[in-house]
């Protein structure tokens, strides 16, 4: 992730360990964290699951170069046999990139070990106890509004499918929206004209929904279901894409939880885009996992996954996202073929139990 967090002052290994959960959004385990610094401030914080697959750290050198990283801190969480090879590889890649590793730590079961310091008086073989909960860094981070969830699973649950009455109500609203579209489409004498009207209305609904969110509103079930159908159309989804802002994260989170599964890939991908733009690559990755679990071939999700795997910065998009007018020029006027992704989803509709 690209860090945009308020500055925290770190002066010891214990401070680093206390800060990491706030940099990645949760308390990691079985993980490798690399924090890149420039001019003494954290610019990026990246995380990998352990054990590392071959080549997982290859994007580090290009990342260091793009972000102007001159120093790094490496932290591994877990037992030595799992952490040490990963830390060694990260340190080697940093050295090749002429990035100085200021500290390299392993943390496990409430103790840490330094790979940089070999002095027994400060870094004993049995490890040094630490407690992130009592650290001044944790207190400072909390005051500054930073949050560290207990683990990655807790973060995953923030966009898990809604259940119970919420799910049942959304299922009914979706069935009604699908029935309405089917009836209107079946009665349309000209499918090209229907496509034009549908896309025009869908573009307006996207902008209205985002404006409502900005003023504190929330889509009701019927509006959410309708927007889920709209976003199946690539041109309508791309309208939302061109408008992406990190402030949209709660909006797309809500829809990722509420929509029926087959309508999730567009909204989860838009959530990933907004999260990535805001520097939260962990949430972006989780959202993309949701999208690709449902539709492994969904192109927007695969494109963003490629960017995240290569540790690309969202800054590459500055000035490069097309405008709505440019999308219209590139894609041409709406026509019946634009409806095919939506029609495929309509065909998947199942009866709702009474």
Give names to the regions the model predicted.
Residues 2-22, 27-29, 43-354:
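Charged, compositionally biased boundary regions
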Residues 32-36:
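Short beta-strand scaffold segments in enzyme catalytic cores
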């Amino acid at each position: 992730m690209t860090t945009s967090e308020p500055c925290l002052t770190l002066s010891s290994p214990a401070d680093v360990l206390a800060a990491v959960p706030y940099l990645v959004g949760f308390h990691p385990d079985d993980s490798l964290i690399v924090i890149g610094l420039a001019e003494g401030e954290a610019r990026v914080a990246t995380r990998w699951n352990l054990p590392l697959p071959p080549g997982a750290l290859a994007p580090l050198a290009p990342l260091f170069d793009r972000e102007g990283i001159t120093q790094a801190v490496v932290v591994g969480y877990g037992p030595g046999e799992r952490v040490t090879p990963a830390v060694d590889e990260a340190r080697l890649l940093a050295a090749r990139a002429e990035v100085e590793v200021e500290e390299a730590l392993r943390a496990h079961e409430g103790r840490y070990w330094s790979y940089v310091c070999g002095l027994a008086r400060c870094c004993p073989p049995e490890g040094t106890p630490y407690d992130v909960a009592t650290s001044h860094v944790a207190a400072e981070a909390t005051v500054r509004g930073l949050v560290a969830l207990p683990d990655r699973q807790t973060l995953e649950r923030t966009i898990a499918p809604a259940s119970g009455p919420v799910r049942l109500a959304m299922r009914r609203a979706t069935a009604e929206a699908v029935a309405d579209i089917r009836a209107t489409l079946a009665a349309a004498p000209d499918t090209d004209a229907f496509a034009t009207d549908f896309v025009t209305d869908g573009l307006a609904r996207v902008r209205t929904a985002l404006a409502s969110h900005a003023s504190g509103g929330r889509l009701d079930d019927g509006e959410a279901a309708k927007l889920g159908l709209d976003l199946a159309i690539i041109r309508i989804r791309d309208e939302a894409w061109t408008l992406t802002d990190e402030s949209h994260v709660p909006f797309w989170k809500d829809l990722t939880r509420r929509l029926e599964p087959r309508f999730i890939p567009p909204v989860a991908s838009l959530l990933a885009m907004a999260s990535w733009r805001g520097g939260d690559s962990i949430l972006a990755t989780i959202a993309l996992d949701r999208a690709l679990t449902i539709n492994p071939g969904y192109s927007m999700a695969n494109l963003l996954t490629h960017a995240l795997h290569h540790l690309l910065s969202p800054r590459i998009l500055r000035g490069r996202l097309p405008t709505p007018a440019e999308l219209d020029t590139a894609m041409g006027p709406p026509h019946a073929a634009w409806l095919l992704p939506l029609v495929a989803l309509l065909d998947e509709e199942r009866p709702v139990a009474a």
